[in-house]
Amino acid sequence: MIALIVTINIKPGHKDAFMASMLDDARGSNKDEPGCLRFDVLQDNDNPNQIHLYEVYQDQAALDAHRQAPHFTKWRETVADWFDGEPSRKVCTTVFRAEDA
């Protein structure tokens, strides 16, 4: 499994529109992508314009499919000008899942 931890800073004045588009993408990822095992959207408690994503994919093919999904490409086009700097991304390998306890 591949896990991504993405941090996005949103330009002031764009948070509400960003979140509406972000939640559409998250719903599409969870609902329409069999290889997407988890897609969580988190708001930073100290910075309301900072969003963290926690995404888990079955494998590289599932991650590649996510990046080609219509809801993802629509999201990227919609929010591109609302990023305050480039998002940071950590790619991780899942070692243990709580569901496996």
Question: Where do the language-model regions lie?
Answer:
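Short phosphate-engaging motifs
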Residues: 14, 49, 71
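N-terminal first-folded block
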Residues: 2-32, 36-40
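Residue-level signal for secondary-structure boundary sites
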Residues: 14-16, 61, 97
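An amphipathic, aromatic/His-enriched active-site/gating alpha helix that lines ligand/cofactor pockets
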Residues: 23-37, 56-90
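Short, well-ordered beta-strand segments in beta-rich or mixed alpha/beta enzyme
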Residues: 2-9, 38-67
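Glycine-rich beta-strand-turn "strand-cap" elements at beta-sheet edges
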Residues: 2, 40-49, 77-101
